[in-house]
Structures are given as structure tokens and as C-alpha cells.
Amino acid sequence: ESFEVEKLNLERERLIDLFSNNGIYNFQQRSIRFKAFKDSTGLDKKIPILLEINNSKIRNQELLLDVPYVIKKINSLSVFVENPEKSFRIFTDSINIDGFKIFSTGNLKYNPKIISNGIAIKKNNPYSLNDRKKTYKYFNELQIFKYPSIVYRENIKDSTKLDTEIYL
């Protein structure tokens, strides 16, 4: 098979997709490196390729820390629904449904099932970028919420878990 940079780019995209949809939260593209080795004698026309997947790099003040990737699972899921008629942002109502809690400013104006049906993110499942995209798509297509957003926070007690908040 001939050496083509485009094939390496496609493989990089495949790996990013694989990691990002199987629990690796914030996988960094720059963690993937390909090294090509050429026979200096010119006898072997094949070019061996070495794939390196490095740990993530996180800046902590003056230091650059090397942090291994770990699979992160969804620990909790909360949905916050704002009533556009209310000028304050105090959530006064809540309901438990399908393993998560929906908070609202005032009485919830929407059927909770309409909200829960669109959430592809599930408690105890590994983080998945595709689940995040599906959830965004659902709420954007409803066209009843202005700026849906999804926030993931590393759990304080267990760094392998993510607490998820959806703002509608």
C-alpha cells in the first residue's frame, strides 16, 4: 500500500472519534503522532509507520503536567429550564424523571417527557461526544429553547466521573 498523508489524516480522525465516543473526555488531537521510517539504503520501498498516542498535557500555573487519559462515566445529570418571563434565576421547582432531575424557575412549562426523550446522555454510561451532539440537535430542533448548553464537570470525589448539567 502506498504512503499517503491523507490516509494518516483519516486514521487520526477515526481514532479521535473512537476515543471521544468511548469515555475519553476532552481527547486532544495533538496526542496522536505518526512517525514514518525510511530505509536509508533505498532497498526497502515500504515505509513503516509508528503510531504514538501520548498522555494529555495540562498546564498548571508554570508547569505542564502529563496526565493519562482515563475513561470517564456520567455520574449525575441535571437539567435546568429557565422561564424566559422570570427575570431572576432561582430554580424553585424540580422533578425526578428517568434517573435525573429537572429544575425550573417557577412551574415547569413543558412536559418532562419532552425534555427527557431528547437526552442521549445517560447516567453511568461512558462519556460520548455523539451523545452530546444528539442531545444538542434534539433541543435545537425543538426551537423552544434559545441557547441550550451542556456542561461537564469532573466529579470532586472521583475524577473518573463527570457531573453533567444541561441548561435550557
Residue ranges and their predicted role:
Residues E1-L168:
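Immediate N-terminus of the mature polypeptide
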